[in-house]
Amino acid sequence: MTTTNYSADDTALLIVDPYNDFMSKGGKIYEHTKETAEAVGFYDNMRKMIPAVRAAHIQVIIVPHHRWREGDYKGWKHMNPSQIRSNEARSFAAGTWGGEFHPEFGPREGDVIVLEHWAQSGFANTDLDSQLKQRGFRK
């Protein structure tokens, strides 16, 4: 087993889209990801990694997807397939259980929560790049 040491000065853990719709049984997207998540031990690994990162005083950054609201995509001419599906399913709908952060994997006091992203990239149209650079995170 290889041991890697990470410095809290330049390392952050990014947790992407930790919503109930994605990470909880009964969530709108959960069944689509369940098989792969279970095959790789995703949830068990997250349950080990997040507390270890917090104990090492490494910054946690939450990278949330946009929470669906009525009319969000009205008039859009160039929605990608993911946005079309998200709009139809109302994934991560604001004000619903599915749009709430998962109780185990969501933010805690001291975490940084970046602006919500609208598609597959946590960088496009958010402040993630700026947050990482301003805080000196390179890993």
Regions found by a protein language model. Give the residues of each.
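Active-site acidic carboxylates
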Residues: 1-108
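Internal catalytic-core helix/loop-beta-alpha segment
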Residues: 91-139
